[in-house]
From Swiss-Prot:
Protein name in UniProt: (S)-tetrahydroprotoberberine N-methyltransferase
EC number: 2.1.1.122
Subcellular location(s) per record: Cytoplasm
Pfam families registered for this protein in UniProt: CMAS (PF02353)
Major site of localization recorded for this protein: cytoplasm
Active site, per annotation: 325
Residues annotated for S-adenosyl-L-methionine binding in this entry: 91, 129, 153, 157, 179-180, 195
Name of the gene encoding the protein in the UniProt record: TNMT
pH profile: Optimum pH is 8.
Amino acid sequence: MGSSAGEIMGRLMKGEIEDEELKKLIRHQWDRRIEWGYKPTHEKQLAFNLDFIKGLKEMVMSGEIDTMNKETYELPTAFLEAVFGKTVKQSCCYFKDENSTIDEAEEAAHELYCERAQIKDGQTVLDIGCGQGGLVLYIAEKYKNCHVTGLTNSKAQANYIEQQAEKLELTNVDVIFADVTKFDTDKTYDRILVVETIEHMKNIQLFMKKLSTWMTEDSLLFVDHISHKTFNHNFEALDEDDWYSGFIFPKGCVTILSSSTLLYFQDDVSALDHWVVNGMHMARSVEAWRKKLDETIEAAREILEPGLGSKEAVNQVITHIRTFCIGGYEQFSYNNGEEWMITQILFKKK
């Protein structure tokens, strides 16, 4: 679109790109990704997807999670509370209608997970990659006889969940601070939930095998992930003109699977049900986060500056988050939410 990747990044970090121009620049990158991902025949599309899946099976279990934690997840809790909804859900929310607020959409998403994962009172539940614990706390409050365990590799997240559970006087919550790829246990769980976490895995076959060892014959595994309806891709730069992908996520951190790719990983589990959620739900989520950030921008700066040390560092973080939200809207609203979307699959142990 005329400017080099370096020029665009230079202008972006100086605050010289208005939102409307930024939307066009990002949309151009998604146009290019679509052109790259779709093949001229179904035979070539299938071969392309199978090559990608074969490549995943030859990799280590996960991507560069530590790098991503530092850059994306270890922001002050007060900042996260200012930007996200009441449960600090940093994944797709579910908007039941045009008037749904972000708080209502967070709750509706948790409700949908419980319905599709067939959560019932009295079960043991493990939430892998549990974030700030919104789903853990939702289940623990709603199903008083469930014992809910959250697993996170962020100490800040683990501390936050423990504090919230204490505040809510919940005695049926545990938090495990661990990297899931290195963690192991002899325990089994009635339900295992993996919400927008499998994107950080590479060798999904190894990951699913590990999860299956924590399941009994009656256990169910519910996986929710960002997807494209047709093709797989790493969230990495296509070429030197792609300034956007590497700015949003460090290389090697995020893989976006197609909506059917997990069906190729049934060595240790078997799919029972399969759903997709239109991408506009994610588009509306990131748009709500951006609006909340813009509305509380001065307070957000004050929260961030002590930890980051300078106004320049604060500006960089805010630019990154706003670009993530604007880019996410362009991605998930593409073709009215019928390109990138959320896929959900329910598995049982084989």
